[in-house]
Amino acid sequence: MRRGERRVAGGSGSESPLLKGRRSTESEVYDDGTNTFFWRAHTLTVLFILTCALGYVTLLEETPQDTAYNTKRGIVASILVFLCFGVTQAKDGPFSRPHPAYWRFWLCVSVVYELFLIFILFQTVQDGRQFLKYVDPRLGVPLPERDYGGNCLIYDADNKTDPFHNIWDKLDGFVPAHFIGWYLKTLMIRDWWMCMIISVMFEFLEYSLEHQLPNFSECWWDHWIMDVLVCNGLGIYCGMKTLEWLSLKTYKWQGLWNIPTYKGKMKRIAFQFTPYSWVRFEWKPASSLHRWLAVCGIILVFLLAELNTFYLKFVLWMPPEHYLVLLRLVFFVNVGGVAMREIYDFMDELKPHRKLGQQAWLVAAITVTELLIVVKYDPHTLTLSLPFYISQCWTLGSILVLTWTVWRFFLRDITMRYKETRRQKQQSHQARAVNNRDGHPGPDDDLLGTGTAEEEGTTNDGVTAEEGTSAAS
């Protein structure tokens, strides 16, 4: 069976679900069990190709005398060997399409990225910034000052040629980036409420931290209309429609060579890039304290990862348009979906000894390491105190959340148990009163009556026995 598909294939032409213990949120999957060359591990093939490549470099290629070049090439070769090992030997995750090796590759990239972050963390601030020159010589230079915010008029009457120039100036490449980003985040989280909460809370964070990072300073309509309603809102809406289609889709798979028509073969190839099966996420944060804290933790990590994007660029002197910034976003898009599925399975697992998935573990470690780099490289910026009115707002919000948590999971349960006990007592008293009015003894009266009758019977028996003895004598 294919690696990464956690199901047992039925026989050829089988039309029964593959997983008997399927959850109610999981779709039914039908598979003919075809195992082709595409799905095999190819561990020996990869080892042979890797050995040939290393042998060619060692025996046939002349080693350059450039120390810096050799160092870079040695590091890249070491990473490639590790990726080859991981792609063929690492443990499969929950996803298997388009191929399990694809997700094993991103798992290994996560390890490499975390090791890179650890290396940067252990350098001095100056050495860490200058080390990035080995990646790109244009890095390691302080970022130029930029003007953010500016004129926030939607209609600028002073500009006769184009009074809406402020709006057109905001329509840059970040608009489609926001839309695509939130479309993909919705596919990861699979919940409208959580997506909207994260979207709105991040705008509040931008308001709160604009005294630390100048690029957080935006116009009000850029925050709430362009970002929340248009870009983020439209991306979330399209993502929810895609989730609806995926949850209703029939997951029935056949081997490519078992499909008779060319149109069917092309359709099968296209559907190779869709999920093998589908699980609808039901987070249910208010169902228990455990799930409530877990959902709050997920939202916190999401917001922290978003903030790290901006703070890392600031402390490591990376321009927003640099390709490393884009590569980091692509990385999180690929690993985020796997991590969310593993977290959901971890929360939904009924076993007493649960284990967090490997990709979720790495994503959490990466997010924390990025935060530590920001704290070490620019503590002055992070320690700039919040304005008083902003700190008051966050304090009030925290108190409200804490109060609701205590009421929902502690006081409410105690109150409900107390009311239920009172209700049962009242019903018992009412039933006893009704029985007494009807002339029937209540439960306690029955017990008392039985005890009296037994005592009387015992007394009468004793008297009868005494009388019988007297008569005999």
Curated annotation (Swiss-Prot):
Its EC number is 2.7.8.29. Glycans are attached at residue 159. Highly expressed in testis. Detected at lower levels in kidney and heart. The chain crosses the membrane at residues 41-61, 75-95, 105-125, 292-312, 314-334, 355-375, 382-402. Pathway: Phospholipid metabolism; phosphatidylserine biosynthesis. Residues 62-74, 126-291, 335-354, 403-473 are lumenal. Residues 1-40, 96-104, 313, 376-381 are cytoplasmic. It is an enzyme of class 2 (transferase). Signal peptide: none annotated. The modification Phosphoserine is found at residues 12, 14, 16. It is found in: Endoplasmic reticulum membrane; Membrane. It is a multi-pass membrane protein. Its main location: endoplasmic reticulum. Keywords: Endoplasmic reticulum, Glycoprotein, Lipid biosynthesis, Lipid metabolism, Membrane, Phospholipid biosynthesis, Phospholipid metabolism, Phosphoprotein, Transferase, Transmembrane, Transmembrane helix. One of its GO terms (biological process) is phosphatidylserine biosynthetic process. Catalyzes a base-exchange reaction in which the polar head group of phosphatidylethanolamine (PE) or phosphatidylcholine (PC) is replaced by L-serine. Catalyzes the conversion of phosphatatidylethanolamine and does not act on phosphatidylcholine. Can utilize both phosphatidylethanolamine (PE) plasmalogen and diacyl PE as substrate and the latter is six times better utilized, indicating the importance of an ester linkage at the sn-1 position. This is Phosphatidylserine synthase 2. It comes from Mus musculus (Mouse). The gene is Ptdss2.
